[in-house]
Amino acid sequence: TLVMLDGEIAYIGPDAAAASGMETIDGTGKWLTPGVIAPFTRIGIVEVGAEDSTNDTRASGTSFSVALRASDGFNPAATTIPVTRIEGVTRVVVAPANGGSMIAGQGFIADTSGAPDSITTDRAFVYIDLGESGAGLAGGSRPAAWAALRGAFADARGYPSRFMAHNEGDTLPARTRKPLALRYGAGSSS
């Protein structure tokens, strides 16, 4: 006997009376297993890989990277979700793909219920590609990728002291080819 209360297992054991008054399902000859977690997927952010309008896995035309949230492109009604659920997968860890940077963006964790609120942990991790394609985006070698990653961490550590100390908040640093905002101080000749 297995008793579920509010979506969680409350009792497992031989006492059938524990389920008295509850909806019962005869599991004779059936398997009962814990839900499977798919630890690296793109389920819900791509419907048809070759069709750009249904593919939110990467943003190759932007200089944003770590700020990108894969959850902003999540479709809980994607056709891949019920198929995945039928196979016993109850949770998916969804990672973005790298586009113009080895830092692809922020991934999330979702259940496979198909409900609008199925994202259980948004911004769960930052996906960084340190493999061959990430190395290519960072300058052509893994040492270049590691140097870029160390630089990104140094920028993140130094950001509060550099930009919050003056409490201005309107300077947007960019280590890309195209700065997103420039601010000139008082008395600037430009």
What are these regions (language model features)?
Residues 9-11, 29, 49-51, 60-64, ...:
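Glycine-rich loops and low-complexity Gly/Arg-rich segments
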Residues 16, 22, 33, 43, ...:
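Protease-associated
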Residues 30-87, 92-95:
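Metal-associated gating/positioning segment near the N- to mid-region
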Residues 74-80, 85-190:
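Polyanionic/metal-chelating signatures
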